[in-house]
Amino acid sequence: MGNLISTCSFSSRVNSTAKITDSSIWYPQPDQHISIRTFRELNQAPTSSPTSTRTEMFLNGVLSRSTDDLQGEDSRQPMTLTPRQLTQDVSRRLLM
C-alpha cells in the first residue's frame, strides 16, 4: 500500500445546527493505482463505513475509473439541498 493522502471539507447553514463533514482517503497503489474512500459525517457523528469507493487506474497510458455506491439505491440523496430539505432530512434520520 502506498502513502496515505487525505482531504476534508466542511459545510453548514447559517440558520441550521446541522453540519456536514466530507472526507476522502487515498491509498496510491503500485502502478499508479488509486483507491478513494469517502466518508460523510452529520453533526460530527462518525459513520461506520464508507459511503462510496472510487478507483482510478492508469495502465499503458489509459485511465480507468469506477465508483461503487456502498449505501444502495434507497439511500442516495441529492448533493444540493435547500435549508428546508436539509432540516427535514436530518429530522427524519434522527427519528429513525
UniProtKB/Swiss-Prot annotation:
Region ranges (Disordered): 66-96
Protein localization: Host cell membrane
GO biological process: symbiont-mediated suppression of host innate immune response
Topology in membrane: Lipid-anchor
GO cellular component: host cell plasma membrane; membrane
Record keywords: Host cell membrane, Host membrane, Host-virus interaction, Inhibition of host innate immune response by virus, Lipoprotein, Membrane, Myristate, Suppressor of RNA silencing, Viral immunoevasion
Function summary: Pathogenicity determinant. May act as a suppressor of RNA-mediated gene silencing, also known as post-transcriptional gene silencing (PTGS), a mechanism of plant viral defense that limits the accumulation of viral RNAs.
Protein name: Protein C4
The organism of origin for this protein: Tomato yellow leaf curl Sardinia virus (isolate Spain-2) (TYLCSV)
Organism phylogeny: Viruses, Monodnaviria, Shotokuvirae, Cressdnaviricota, Repensiviricetes
